[in-house]
Amino acid sequence: MKSSIGDKTEQLNESTMLAAGHHSECLELSCELSELERIREYIFQLPLDSGKKKKIFLACEEIFANIVNYSGADWIQFYYDSRETEVHVIFSDNGKMFNPLESKNEKEFEDFDAGGMGISLVKELCSDIHYSNTDGKNILSMEFSEK
């Protein structure tokens, strides 16, 4: 799993995703946990194998819940892009700036509480993950490749 922060590497963000001409979709979401159902419905209707859908949803569920519970955002955008062997998911929000990739508090499995397994789990599920804050928007992109 690779990860990067800011502009240290070329970022796949919503504008480059859309400009690249790949199949992409965007859901405009309220900052409410009930909106997670829309993400779930969207992911599980995709033409992917069941295991990959579960993996993508688990990572998305963790990121979305963190945005809703801690960011103070008014809105969240969920972008999805699929290519031959990889899927890209991007969350964009207008909440307070927070880079989850800089989290130094890595927990051991036994230490996880009912609140979830956090960014550690997301990093394990993704083949690549990037964060940037541009024009007051948090942008977290995750790549899921065939392994």
Where are the regions that the model predicts?
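Short beta-strand element(s) in the Bergerat
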Residues: 25, 85-89, 138
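Glycine-rich nucleotide-binding loop
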Residues: 97, 135-141
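Conserved ATP-binding N-box helix of the HATPase_c
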Residues: 51-76
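Glycine-rich phosphate-binding loop
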Residues: 112-126
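Conserved post-beta-strand hinge residue in the HATPase_c
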Residues: 94, 117, 145-147
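Glycine-rich/acidic phosphate-handling loop/turn and adjacent ATP-lid/helix
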Residues: 89-115
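Bergerat-fold GHKL ATPase/HATPase_c domain
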Residues: 1-58
